[in-house]
Amino acid sequence: MNLPAANPRSEPRSGSHGDSRLRAIAEAVESSQRVSFEDGLYLDEHADLLFLGQLANTVRERKNGNLAFYNTNVHLNPTNVCVYRCVFCAFRSDLKAERAYTFDEEMIRERVSEATEAGATEIHVVGGLHHQKPFEWYVDVVRVIHDANPRIHIKAWTGVEINWFAHISKKPVEWVLEQLIDAGLGSMPGGGAEIFDEEIRGRICEHKADGQSWLDIHRCAHQLGLRTNATMLYGHLE
């Protein structure tokens, strides 16, 4: 569906509420100038959501016009057994709990087959950190998916999971990522970011990789050519 194009010369400034600096930032965006770090902070502190959305839409339309893009994504969660006990998580399970499960290779292939038949263009893989599984098992999950359908994009393992893999393999993060890329990894999901504030993170997931580790892992992934997402978790302490 084609929507009427926004007027980039008037809409963003309409939400500036007389703020001359916001108007100047909007004019810079409209002129295809890069916003500085300081201007970004000012937007965060002083601009309302609609104003930010209007600026973002100006950039989006410049890049993509009125086209929208999407993929068909299917989740694969190979195990719910997890060594961590994040207070907000309803997914995890203890190893001997009745609800615990772990996929074998046949089950993974079946899931990929279902995704392929449904027209999926991407498999999104996240799961528990199974303390009895070696790093090679997690690599094999990616390898089996890629073998079952070499054309499907594999977005797998969050920064927290990569941190765990480095721990159990006793190898650097870069080496861990290289093994996964060789197996077929195409990008990383943004889970595990949660909230970077140390106090809040310590209360909701104190044993999970800290915010700086998460950022360092994603930075390493970018240096290796992987694209990554980032998520924010809310609905807990606030």
What name fits each language-model region?
Residues 1-75, 79-83:
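Flexible, acidic/Gly-rich N-terminal and inter-domain linker regions that tether
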Residues 51-96, 100-126, 188:
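N-terminal pre-triad scaffold of radical SAM enzymes
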Residues 27-34, 45, 58-65, 91, ...:
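Generic secondary-structure signature for well-ordered alpha-helical cores
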Residues 120-230, 234-237:
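Conserved SAM/AdoMet-binding glycine-rich loop
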Residues 18, 22, 49-53, 101, ...:
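Generic structural signal for well-ordered, non-membrane alpha-helical segments
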